[in-house]
């Protein structure tokens, strides 16, 4: 490979990295700046002259951030469990079980991915109201408890497994649950980690649906609570930046713990042509 192609490739990678990581680093820098530092100076100053954690203390004084974070954690953890269980069972059924309408069911899941959430959000709200789940964390969880994308991801992971292994287990007398739990499921742990990460991120970052379904401040999730850091007539960008960093840190920790499974799982669940 010519040298100029290598240089161009790494230059593009660095440019993409700057676009992806730059805004977060800027928010982190802003959150560490004191009230006497001008965050809108020209040229901009990236490194704070006197780093301080006072902005994080102010976030906790302004809103009950830890209560909101705990509500988000409950919803996100439940979303991980329901997606891992539901998507795994549905994905295995679509990939391995033989029944009439299996292809049609797969098409339904694909079509479900194409429907924008905003287009069905009124129907979701009406359904939650009829079930008496408005203003509850269960009402926040239920619409996204099993994602069509995660189902298809698990389906493709199971399709990539050699079917001969399960056939041999079937000949030895293993039933479908034994083949699923002892052969198929251990082989797709990487994809399961990907599903867990996507489910946690989706629930943790969700703003629109909790904003619509929740009205009691004691049940607010973190994304809604952080919205109250914006003033009506004036904003303290340092305070908002500190709240943003608090919201992002759990996602960074989760990905750091599961990254080796994530990259392996992306390959397991890749869409086959």
Which residues does each predicted region cover?
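A structural signal for multi-pass alpha-helical bundles of membrane permease subunits
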Residues: 5-273
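Short, Lys/Arg-rich, polar N-terminal cytosolic tail immediately upstream
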Residues: 1-3
């Amino acid at each position: 490979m010519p040298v100029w192609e290598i240089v161009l490739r790494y230059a593009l990678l660095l440019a993409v990295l700057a676009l992806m990581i730059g805004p977060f680093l800027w928010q982190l820098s802003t959150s560490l700046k004191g009230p006497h530092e001008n965050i809108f100076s020209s040229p901009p100053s990236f490194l704070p002259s006197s780093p301080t954690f006072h902005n994080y203390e102010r976030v906790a004084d302004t809103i009950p951030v830890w209560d909101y974070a705990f509500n988000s954690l409950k919803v996100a953890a439940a979303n991980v469990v329901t997606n891992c269980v539901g998507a795994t069972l549905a994905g295995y059924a679509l990939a391995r079980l033989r029944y009439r309408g299996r292809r049609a069911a797969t098409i339904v899941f694909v079509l479900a991915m194409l429907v924008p959430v905003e287009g069905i959000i009124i129907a979701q709200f009406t359904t939650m109201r009829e079930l008496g789940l408005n203003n509850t964390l269960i009402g926040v969880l239920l619409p996204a408890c099993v994602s069509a994308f995660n189902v298809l991801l698990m389906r493709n992971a199971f399709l990539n497994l050699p079917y001969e292994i399960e056939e041999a287990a079937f000949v030895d007398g293993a039933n479908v649950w034994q083949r699923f739990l002892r052969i198929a499921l251990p082989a797709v742990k990487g994809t399961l980690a990907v599903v867990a990460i996507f489910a946690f991120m989706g629930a943790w970052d969700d703003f629109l649906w909790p904003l619509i379904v929740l009205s009691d401040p004691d049940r607010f999730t973190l994304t809604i609570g952080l919205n109250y850091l914006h003033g009506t007539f004036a904003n303290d960008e340092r305070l908002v930046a500190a709240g943003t960093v608090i919201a992002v840190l759990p996602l960074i920790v989760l990905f750091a713990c599961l990254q080796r499974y994530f990259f392996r799982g992306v390959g397991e669940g890749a869409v086959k042509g």
